[in-house]
Swiss-Prot record:
Binds 1 Mg(2+) ion per subunit. It comes from Marinobacter nauticus (strain ATCC 700491 / DSM 11845 / VT8) (Marinobacter aquaeolei). One of its GO terms (molecular function) is 2,3-diketo-5-methylthiopentyl-1-phosphate enolase activity. Bifunctional enzyme that catalyzes the enolization of 2,3-diketo-5-methylthiopentyl-1-phosphate (DK-MTP-1-P) into the intermediate 2-hydroxy-3-keto-5-methylthiopentenyl-1-phosphate (HK-MTPenyl-1-P), which is then dephosphorylated to form the acireductone 1,2-dihydroxy-3-keto-5-methylthiopentene (DHK-MTPene). This is Enolase-phosphatase E1. It is an enzyme of class 3 (hydrolase). Its cofactor is Mg(2+). HAMAP family: Salvage_MtnC (MF_01681). Coiled coil: none annotated.
Amino acid sequence: MIRVILTDIEGTTSSISFVHDVLFPYASEHLPEFIRANHHTLPAVAEQLVRVAEISGTDRKDIDGLINVLQEWIAEDRKEGALKALQGMVWEQGYHSGELKGHIYPDAADYLKRWHDRGLRLFVYSSGSVKAQKLIFGHSNEGDFTVFFSGYFDTAVGGKKESQSYRNILAELGVDAGTVLFLSDVEEELRAAEEAGLKTAWLVREGELPDTARVVARDFSEVDALLRKR
């Protein structure tokens, strides 16, 4: 019986275009100014710039060089933790100022509430930082959804296409793998979760449905129908 739902964000609860067409451009535009204004005064910014310098081989004192590296990583959609942390700081400013609103599909908003009210525990697992996850759900077009989630996971537990990452999550949650349903729009992530023993549902919101033995759903209402059968 499913007792825990672990969900991805991009393409699952939220539009991929929101991340790529809104969040990434916003970070790319505002990151240089943010770093120049805060690299001396905010320890959290300085700490992440040290990591960027170590990974890229750039001189820590070369602020313009570090900014260029970060812009390249944004363009490449790199999953570097330092980039995600800095993006999260920039997005936080945007959310608090009201310039940004997180996106949640109406069906996802509806069923996340229903599942929470039915006693299911809800968790997020995304390549975006935990801070960024909380911002998307805390300042969304559907209101504050952080009240419905019991916790958040990012790449600190490992990459989403690695089965060990899901074992790490299970260890933190202290639950049996068979009681967890993982929702994602990426087949490689589903495969990794299945290798760790989790149940899965493949969200395919647009385009043709794949020819697969995996459980496939168009939206969260179809996921709910599957839940009621289990």
